[in-house]
Amino acid sequence: MNYIGSKLKLSNWLETEISNVAGHSLSDKVFCDLFAGTGIVGRKFKTNVKQVIANDMEYYSYVLNRNYIGNCQSILKAGELLQRLEQLPPREGLIYQHYCLGSGSERQYFSDENGKKIDAVRIQIEEWKNTRYIDEDTYYFLLATLLEGADKVANTASVYGAFLKNLKKSALKPLSLEPALFEIGSDGHQVYQADANQLIKNISGDILYLDPPYNARQYGANYHLLNSIALYDDFTPKGKTGLREYSRSKYCSKSDVVPVFEALIRDADFQYIFLSYNNEGLMSVGQVREIFERFGKYDLVQTEYRRFKADKTENRNHKANSTFEYLHILEKTF
């Protein structure tokens, strides 16, 4: 999934730097990914640690992490179920009605054919769940598979803040349900959909990885359509882009981010805390260092990487094609 702030290309670097600090044998450690997004970092550590705790306030993220982190055993008849979903006749449901041109919505997030296919698949998954034909693990596996497939054929410039006037090449391809595969192993991992500053008061562990929003862009707005597919609830889309109501993170606010971040660190019951942030974030390196040094031993490592695709396609007028990713490190002592 093409995702703002995705750590896919940085995951090996992150694993190395975290292991250099917390130890290379992590089998007895509890690892928490508090702003999990698509779960890339938690997935990297899933088979190497005792337990992963994954959290994000967005429901689409919960669905993805409930599958990639929460699921640990093979899904029975996964191939058969996906084949049946692929063969469903199209249905004119919520996605077609609100986000496809053919419905008269004046929005074009998907081709008419893909919108109807998404509806058919989403409705069937819910029916299987409600009739107990599938269990909870299978439900989230199928939902995650649908979200991944829908994202690949979305007619957007990487995020869902707006749709493109004409269907791009990838949006013309038919929806395909490629299984959202996850690592098999021991269970006991935990997945939450909660406010990070509230959840941190009720969990504890060894390694806390933080990847909060860097800037003013709200994930609930940028990925509203993934929430709509995941929730598939009755709502009224607003405006030209069809936004739904969404939660706003204080980590996207210049005036709020420092106090909420300091409160988070204060309440964290973890020995090692790692913060991913970049050189264009709302908090400066100095501000983060000042907060971390109040609670223990501080260090900083960094690496250069290429800018997220949407930054280059949405007329953001950035001067540089790359940014610096900072990994702030705290060994908490008080």
Swiss-Prot record:
It comes from Neisseria lactamica. The keyword S-adenosyl-L-methionine applies. One of its GO terms (biological process) is DNA restriction-modification system. Belongs to the N(4)/N(6)-methyltransferase family. It is an enzyme of class 2 (transferase). Its EC number is 2.1.1.72. Keywords: DNA-binding, Methyltransferase, Restriction system, S-adenosyl-L-methionine, Transferase. This is Type II methyltransferase M.NlaIII. InterPro entries: DNA_methylase_N6_adenine_CS, MeTrfase_D12, SAM-dependent_MTases_sf. It catalyses: a 2'-deoxyadenosine in DNA + S-adenosyl-L-methionine = an N(6)-methyl-2'-deoxyadenosine in DNA + S-adenosyl-L-homocysteine + H(+).
